[in-house]
């Protein structure tokens, strides 16, 4: 009896220990459904800036390190693959220095233009990244108009004088035209303000929504129309994630014609919806974000930024996400993805470069977000993106929890043969993993704790017509008869090469009586659309 009691006691202890250990390592797979047919916003890209002389600081590290930094920022095989470059339109301010300060202005007075390439140290970098990496989205943002246009005669603080609205509209148009004709730089996007709700000792200029509307409606629109300017105008770019500074322009018929994109930053705020922007069919760009506190270079900080991208894509449903500096001289905070030591001429890479790169390297301009179960289990966040033209796709899955998660991805409406994972964790940086076979329309993969993985693959962009199992481009009685033959095992496959895939009309990864019944209803007219 005592032996039995001892055995029972030991069994209970082992069960308790096993129960305590189990959650750390063994989980039933959670399911993510990825639906090719449910589409959301088009992605314009991801980007960084090297404003305030950071482009020159990169060059000062020497050609070898400059190329290494360029690769880390813009290469789609060695780095983050950024596709947007944000620059400052020089204002000639007197604050700062050669390491961190404004560029010279091309218009030092109302009657004087000074088109010298040396006035803008970003030009040489733009040429290099365009020729070396194909970067063709060039955004120039104005932190401040030249001092002679301002209410206080300074590039710091103050506002644009109303009697200089036309001068400012002309100033913007002339920069776009002359950068193309004199420097070979196509400014594709122009931001008319940076953080209009903030007065600073560095370059700044305050605006209200009403002032924006007056300037756009009465000055910028007619000037850009007259000069044939095609650059897209980014409106707003306030400190927080809000469309409020663009509302007046969005609701004015004339101003709306040149309000192409509503810009925002996200300092000290949460991502929100932009209902008016969406209703008017305009784009949404976050043009800047960073951490001005301590420089956390770990995976914890890195995952913070990948979660920000997830929120921006799913809540705001934005089109472009930009970090602040790509590489910068500040080693003590998080303003840059790469920190350069200008004394030792060395640099260090923060983990956030790679976690952001899990999106920016693989999701290319023109891709489209499509449906995926966004939060299948606590601390796991998933989004999916595709190139509608080629069938390439990327599924980004992040786990910022402390336990591994097994996730099954059920693919609806597309059938790749395999996916390739790329992972960033505390020990990996965009590391390519072993190819995973897709079987029966799904695959299962472990998502390690505190990591982010992008699953990359390709699918047939012309999958055929569901229900058309004989390949004659129509669903009819012939297909119905073939279904019947398949179910009673007279045939083991269908005449069309994609017949087995196209026969699964309810998307449950099997061909059975349910599909047969759905085809019957479709042919009888009881339903007008198949589930897939």
Regions found by a protein language model. Give the residues of each.
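Carbohydrate-binding surface patches
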Residues: 375-417, 450
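Glycoside hydrolase catalytic-domain groove-lining segments
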Residues: 114-124, 230-233, 256-297
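Aromatic/acidic polysaccharide-binding cleft in carbohydrate-active enzymes
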Residues: 281-361, 368-378
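Cellulosome-associated attachment modules in secreted, modular CAZymes
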Residues: 19-28, 460-532
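Active-site cleft segment of glycoside hydrolase catalytic domains centered on the general acid/base Glu
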Residues: 148-252, 271-279
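C-terminal beta-strand-rich structural cap/linker in extracellular carbohydrate-active enzymes
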Residues: 435-461
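N-terminal catalytic cores of secreted or lumenal carbohydrate-active enzymes
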Residues: 29-187, 218
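Sec-dependent N-terminal signal peptides of Gram-positive bacterial secreted proteins and lipoproteins
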Residues: 4-25
């Amino acid at each position: 009896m005592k032996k039995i009691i001892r055995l029972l006691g030991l069994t209970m202890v082992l069960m308790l220990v096993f129960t305590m250990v189990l959650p750390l390592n063994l989980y039933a797979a959670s399911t993510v459904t990825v639906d090719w047919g449910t589409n959301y916003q088009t992605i314009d890209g991801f980007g960084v800036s090297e404003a305030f002389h950071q482009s020159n600081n990169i060059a000062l590290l020497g050609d070898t390190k400059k190329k290494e930094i360029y690769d880390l920022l813009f290469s789609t095989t060695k780095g983050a693959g950024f596709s947007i470059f944000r620059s400052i339109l020089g204002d000639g301010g007197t604050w700062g220095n050669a390491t961190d300060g404004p560029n010279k202005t091309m218009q030092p007075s109302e009657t004087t233009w000074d088109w010298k390439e040396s006035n803008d140290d970003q030009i040489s970098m733009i040429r290099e990244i365009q020729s070396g990496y194909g970067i063709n989205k060039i955004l120039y943002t104005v932190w401040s108009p030249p001092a002679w246009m301002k209410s206080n005669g300074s590039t710091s603080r103050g506002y644009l004088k109303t009697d200089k609205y036309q001068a400012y509209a002309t100033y913007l148009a002339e920069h776009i035209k002359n950068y193309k004709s004199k420097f070979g730089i196509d400014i594709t996007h122009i931001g008319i303000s940076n953080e209009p709700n903030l007065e600073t000792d560095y370059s700044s200029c305050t605006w209200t929504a009403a002032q924006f509307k007056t300037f756009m409606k009465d000055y910028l629109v007619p000037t850009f129309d007259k000069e044939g300017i095609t650059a897209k105008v980014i409106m707003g770019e306030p400190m927080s994630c809000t469309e409020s500074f663009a509302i007046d322009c969005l609701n004015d018929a004339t101003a709306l014609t040149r309000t192409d994109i509503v810009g925002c930053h996200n300092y000290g705020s949460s991502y929100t919806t932009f209902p008016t922007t969406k209703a008017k069919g305009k784009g949404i760009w976050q043009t800047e974000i960073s951490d001005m506190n301590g420089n956390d270079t770990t995976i914890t900080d890195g995952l913070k930024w990948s979660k920000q991208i997830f929120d921006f894509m799913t809540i705001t449903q934005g089109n472009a996400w930009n970090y602040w500096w790509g590489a910068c001289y500040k080693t003590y905070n998080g303003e840059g993805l790469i920190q350069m030591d200008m004394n030792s001429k060395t640099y260090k890479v923060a983990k956030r470069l790679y976690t952001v790169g899990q999106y920016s390297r693989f999701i290319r301009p023109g891709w489209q977000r499509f449906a995926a179960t966004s939060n299948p289990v606590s601390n796991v966040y998933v989004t999916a993106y595709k190139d509608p033209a080629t069938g390439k796709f990327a599924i980004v899955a992040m786990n910022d929890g402390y336990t591994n998660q097994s996730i099954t991805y059920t693919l609806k409406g597309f059938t790749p043969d395999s996916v390739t994972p790329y992972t960033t964790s505390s020990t990996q940086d965009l590391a390519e993993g072993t190819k995973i076979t897709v079987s029966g329309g799904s695959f299962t993969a472990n998502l390690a704790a505190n990591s982010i993985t992008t699953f990359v693959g390709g699918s047939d962009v012309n999958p055929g017509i569901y229900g058309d199992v004989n390949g004659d481009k129509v669903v009819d009685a012939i297909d119905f008869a073939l279904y019947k033959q398949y179910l009673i095992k007279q045939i083991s496959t269908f005449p069309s090469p994609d017949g087995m895939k196209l026969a699964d009309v309810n998307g449950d990864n099997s061909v059975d009586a349910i599909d047969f019944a759905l085809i019957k209803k479709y042919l009888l007219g009881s339903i007008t659309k198949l589930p897939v």
